């Protein structure tokens, strides 16, 4: 595991629901009441580290450290963890970190047969712009040499897009695949503190980018315990090229601000 991972933030159910079908460890510092409700109802406390005891839900403390990285940033952006600390927290909770599982998150091309999605007949998708909110925007540009999409994010400080760089390597992040899924997203009712709710059960339009092209399809997630599935226009499960994949769940309201070419 990496020497440093973070910043570590509080848990939200929209992330948990993506992990639940794979029995993945959910590691964070605190969580929304809605997230704890999912943990309680679906009996996921045995794989939840850093949660809250709302609804009498069992908890397991996380292990982390503070590092401002020499920057003037808000306190909530200074908490980090590491492979060693994650293993320690899991050991403290009696949670094993190894088990057999042969299912992947997406349907990736089989490396044993040399299979790939050549994106034949697909429309051009060499640049992609995604808007989540007024200040949360990402853009990608396809680099044919590395066959990856290089990532940029909008900076409120500079007022422009800047390269998204891995702090440990100094290199710009690049992805073999991009998947953009549109979904109804709205604030939980009541005093939720602006915690957002993703209506996964609604499904929606999906855009798969790879090799500088795009395929339009549909995604589905029948319940929190069901995996997210992506289908092409023929109804077949979308074939993903092997490699690092960026997943964006985008509010239907931001559809007009989504563009690619």
Which sequence ranges carry the predicted segments?
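A surface/extracellular/periplasmic glyco- and lipid-processing/surface-interacting theme
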Residues: 3-261
